[in-house]
Regions:
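A structural signal for short, well-ordered beta-strand segments and their strand-loop junctions
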Residues: 10, 41-42, 129-135, 205-209, ...
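Active-site neighborhoods of enzymes that stabilize oxyanions during catalysis
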Residues: 115-116, 286-429
Length: 446
């Protein structure tokens, strides 16, 4: 018997607490799904930033294997900053044309590891039809031309591919008002496309990405975001349920995985990570955004990562730094260090484990450090702090994410009709592939 078709719903930035309150009745569509599924709190990756997290969801591997390290990073080979959209000011600082190219094309076409198979590639290699709506990690086998006449460069996505109105594999009539992001325009667009797809039963697998909750959470904080954006999120979920003929008909037709990519915590203060490292400005490149930062050593650097980490000991915005020394990772916090490395029965450690007293912190830190595009020193922000981006912007007074702390790292995970105990966002794609019986090859296990 063929596997039931599957919808993956990703609500950007929704915390477990927000989902749990929604499931108590504040959001009818989410409450309906919660009543019919298995729910648990799961764990994101580090840095808990959208490009990194969505790449982990789409590939089923951590950043050490998929190679997307952050929202903003230093490209060692091309000797330039890559900026995926921390803010408009950051895009302008990095170069708008290059940043748009990096975000729309290069993240999938050049930066995402060719060895990390996406869920769309894996399923369509089995003869299934995959669809993606607005998700920024979209790499597939099908060539798509942009909808804008003067933009001619193609992107490769799944057979049914919808990307903020710029790429549309099918004419759906869905409106896309980029300038009304605060009014929920991206989720309205997703809902219109999702309704069109479900009405036609036009896929075997759908990645349905809803981003407006995160936008509201950055602006107002994770708690007030529920008042601003929860109804919009719920309406977008209700749209695809109604398109199937109602809740029972929807679940008769589709299995469901619902998750967030990361959590969100309240931010009260902003800091520039570059400031305490200013004496080494000609030896390093600092890239920071939200609640995670990176420091890259230039070839001429005389300073080492241990000295840089010690320099950050007294910075209130910094909770922990991470670096590699030999075959070990070193986490440093308030002059204390923890050394760790993978071992055949788990982890070999030396030092105070409380330095990384966060969800799945050893594995998440190791994967981040293994990323060939990551900085030589990684920095996780302290509670209540955020690092200003290239344009000097931060979300003080609102919400943010990116660090190792629990609030940034925990996500809601709900499954309906999908086997397996999914506890991490990296386990979503393996579960989806298993659901459809898609084979796994050696390269997928990196």
């Amino acid at each position: 018997m063929p596997a039931k078709k599957l919808v993956l719903i990703v609500v950007d930035g929704m915390t477990p607490a927000a989902f749990e309150r929604a499931a108590d009745g504040r959001a009818p569509a989410l409450a309906f799904l919660a009543a019919h599924g298995e729910y648990r709190r799961g764990t994101s990756v580090f840095p808990s930033l959208t490009p990194v997290c969505l790449s982990s969801i789409a590939t089923g591997v951590g950043p050490g294997a998929h190679h997307i390290p952050h929202l903003v990073w230093w490209h060692r080979g091309e000797r330039r900053i890559v900026e995926y959209g921390s803010s408009f000011s950051a895009l302008r600082a990095a170069g708008i044309a290059q940043s748009i190219t990096d975000t729309v094309y290069n993240m999938n076409g050049a930066h995402l590891s060719a060895q990390a198979t996406t869920v769309y590639e894996a399923l369509e290699d089995e003869g299934l039809v995959a669809a993606a709506v607005n998700i920024t990690c979209y790499r597939g086998r099908t060539r798509h031309l942009p909808t804008i006449p003067w933009v001619t460069k193609a992107a490769f996505g799944p057979k049914r591919f919808f990307y903020y109105g710029l790429f549309e594999s099918d004419a759906t009539g869905a409106p896309m008002a980029v300038r009304n992001r605060a009014g929920g325009s991206t989720d309205l667009y997703a809902a219109a496309v999702g309704r069109w797809l479900v009405t036609r039963d036009g896929f075997d697998f759908l990645a349905y990405y809803l981003s407006d909750f995160d936008y509201a959470s950055h602006a107002y904080g994770p708690d007030l975001a529920e008042d601003v954006a929860l109804a919009r999120t719920d309406a977008a979920v209700q749209a695809i349920i109604d398109a199937a003929g109602g809740g029972d008909a929807f679940l008769e037709r589709y299995a469901v995985v619902l998750a967030s990519d990361h959590g969100q915590t309240r931010v009260e203060r902003g800091a520039r990570l570059e400031t305490p490292l200013a004496p080494f400005a000609d030896e390093i490149v600092v890239t920071a955004s939200n609640r995670a930062g990176q420091v890259y050593l230039l070839p001429r650097a005389r300073v080492d990562t241990a000295e840089l980490a010690a320099r950050l000991d007294d910075e209130p915005a910094v909770e922990v730094t991470l670096r590699i020394e030999g075959d070990e990772a070193v986490a440093r916090r308030e002059r204390e260090e923890l050394r760790f490395r993978p071992h055949f029965d788990g982890w070999q450690t030396s030092g105070d484990l409380s330095i990384l007293d966060h969800p799945d912190a050893l594995a998440r830190s190791w994967s981040a450090l293994e990323n060939p595009n990551a900085g030589d020193l990684l920095v996780s922000a302290a509670e209540g702090w955020e690092f200003a981006d290239l344009g000097g912007r931060h979300h003080a007074g609102g919400g943010s994410h990116g660090s190792l702390v629990t609030g940034d790292s925990e996500v809601p995970l709900l499954t309906i009709g999908v086997s397996g105990d999914i506890g991490r966002i990296t386990e979503i794609t393996p579960a989806v592939r298993a659901h459809f019986g898609a084979r796994v090859v050696a390269a997928d296990a990196v």
